[in-house]
């Protein structure tokens, strides 16, 4: 399979049109382990246990699917600490991807994230990425720097509102991490991690993790492509006025502007507009 004029071609030069699906939503969260036990979580069994794989994959084949957008996360690969890769999880991935290939289904690997991490209201990056920048991952909800489903009831009345999770893109936790990941050298050049600029350090860790994953999975013949990052966000980058609300996907409930988010994250009370 190859590409000509932005079109996928098979060995005979015919256009290839895939029928695909995501696999799967459960892969964003560990099988076991909560927000506090992040070093020892396990993603083995996501998207499903090996013993159930045959039934699920045969069903997808019968339904006519020829491509799977296979979800992995940075946290699943490197949750224990920088450079500490979960080889057991990678071995599990190799087995699952081999079974997918045996069904004649192709795979596009999708390094997934929503609002940076589970500690900032979504999924994706490991907790240590925040801790390396001095954030207390157990206190982000308390100061409004994140709204997580796991800790919402501790600080708010009622249940976790539907579709409020995208508002985390504008809260301090996720907005700061994305700003530093993509623009730290420009906007915060004196912010360092282990003596290196925050942007360079974070990007090097992320890319090193993806390279390691690629090396472990490169013999899986079902893989035809590899994504970079699902739905990256600019954080505060591009905002014209940090007093207001910009770069937002959804405005629901109390929504702080950039400066308000920074003040609240420092432990001070602020009044935020409610949408």
Label every model-predicted segment.
Residues 1-67, 98, 102, 106, ...:
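N-terminal carbohydrate-binding accessory modules
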Residues 3-4, 95-98, 102-108, 113-275:
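Active-site region of glycoside hydrolase catalytic domains
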Residues 20-24, 69-73, 108-112, 227-229:
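A cross-family glycoside hydrolase active-site/sugar-binding cleft signature
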Residues 24-28, 74-77, 113-116, 231-234:
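Solvent-exposed loop/turn segments at secondary-structure junctions
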Residues 33-34, 78-82, 240:
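Short acidic, glycine/proline-rich loop/turn micro-motifs
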Residues 55-60, 89-96, 209, 213:
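A general structural detector for well-ordered alpha-helical segments in enzyme core domains, enriched
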Residues 65-90:
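Aromatic-lined carbohydrate-binding/catalytic grooves of carbohydrate-active enzymes
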């Amino acid at each position: 399979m190859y590409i000509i004029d932005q079109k996928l071609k098979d060995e005979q030069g015919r256009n290839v049109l895939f029928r695909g699906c995501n696999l799967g939503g459960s892969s964003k969260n560990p099988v076991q382990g909560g927000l506090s036990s992040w070093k020892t979580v396990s993603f083995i069994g996501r998207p499903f246990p090996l013993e159930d794989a045959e039934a699920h994959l045969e069903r997808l084949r019968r339904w006519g699917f020829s491509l799977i957008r296979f979800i992995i996360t940075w946290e699943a690969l490197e949750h224990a600490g920088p450079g500490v890769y979960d080889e057991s999880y990678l071995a599990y991935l190799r087995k699952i991807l081999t079974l997918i290939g045996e069904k004649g289904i192709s795979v596009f690997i999708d390094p997934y994230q929503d609002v940076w991490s589970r500690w900032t209201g979504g999924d994706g990056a490991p907790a240590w990425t925040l801790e390396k920048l001095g954030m207390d991952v157990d206190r982000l909800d308390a100061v409004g720097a994140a709204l997580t489903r796991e800790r919402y009831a501790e600080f708010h009345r009622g249940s976790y509102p539907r579709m409020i999770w995208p508002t985390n893109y504008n809260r301090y936790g996720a907005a700061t991490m994305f700003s530093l990941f993509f623009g730290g050298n420009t906007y915060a050049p004196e912010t360092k991690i282990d003596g290196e600029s925050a942007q360079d350090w974070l990007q090097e860790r992320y890319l090193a993790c993806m390279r390691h994953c690629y090396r472990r999975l490169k013999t899986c013949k079902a893989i035809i492509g590899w994504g970079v990052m699902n739905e990256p966000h600019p954080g505060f980058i591009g905002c014209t006025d940090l007093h207001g609300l910009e770069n937002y996907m959804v405005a629901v409930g109390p929504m702080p502007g950039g400066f308000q988010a920074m003040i609240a994250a420092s432990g001070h009370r602020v009044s935020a507009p409610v949408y």
